[in-house]
């Protein structure tokens, strides 16, 4: 659905449910900005759900990249929690709660569980998904998709080197970690 139509529908719903158009528009702008930034920060996931603006890029999983992404998520969480849910339509209230809890879950993974420092397979899956998502679906001419595949493949050695630098305490059985590291060596 085109963004203008979605925004118009959101405004109509807001009027019918008691939220003011300005409040509904502000919330919609916040959500749109959040997802624009999310897709930019996570181009591999963006490709997998059909957003193709960043098909030639891979996620920045470096420590600096993780810090920037975490700060972005905290800013989004602060902005969402600052919105009084009583000013939103029922649907927007639900969307707000879902997004808040999704962000909290991601922050738990990144800041507390720190999977990116424990699971070598994160980097292997990122590398394989980066290419698979481009060739698996026929969303653009093959030549266009192959240009993106080549661009991403050129970034895979850096992605795997980032994983090697980030992993501090491999998670799970040592055979699981060895298997992930072996797969990483085979695709680098």
Predicted regions located by residue number:
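Gram-negative bacterial Sec-dependent N-terminal signal peptides
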Residues: 1-23
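N-terminal maturation segment of proteins
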Residues: 21-188
């Amino acid at each position: 659905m085109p963004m203008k139509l979605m925004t118009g529908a959101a405004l109509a719903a807001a009027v019918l449910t008691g939220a003011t158009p300005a409040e509904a528009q502000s919330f919609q702008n916040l959500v749109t900005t959040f997802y624009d930034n999310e897709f930019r920060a996570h181009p591999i996931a963006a490709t997998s759900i059909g957003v193709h603006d960043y098909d030639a890029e891979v996620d920045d999983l470096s420590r600096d990249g993780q810090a920037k992404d975490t700060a972005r998520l905290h800013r989004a969480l602060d902005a969402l929690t600052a919105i009084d849910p009583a000013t939103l339509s029922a649907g927007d209230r639900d969307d707000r709660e879902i997004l808040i809890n999704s962000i909290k879950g991601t922050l738990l993974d990144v800041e507390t569980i720190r999977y990116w420092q424990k699971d070598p397979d994160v980097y292997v899956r990122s590398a394989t998904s980066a290419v698979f998502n481009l060739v698996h679906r026929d969303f653009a001419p093959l030549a266009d998709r192959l240009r993106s595949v080549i661009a991403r493949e050129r970034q895979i050695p850096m992605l795997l080197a980032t994983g090697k630098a980030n992993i501090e305490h491999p998670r799970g059985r040592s055979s699981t970690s060895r298997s992930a590291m072996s797969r990483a060596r085979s695709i680098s």
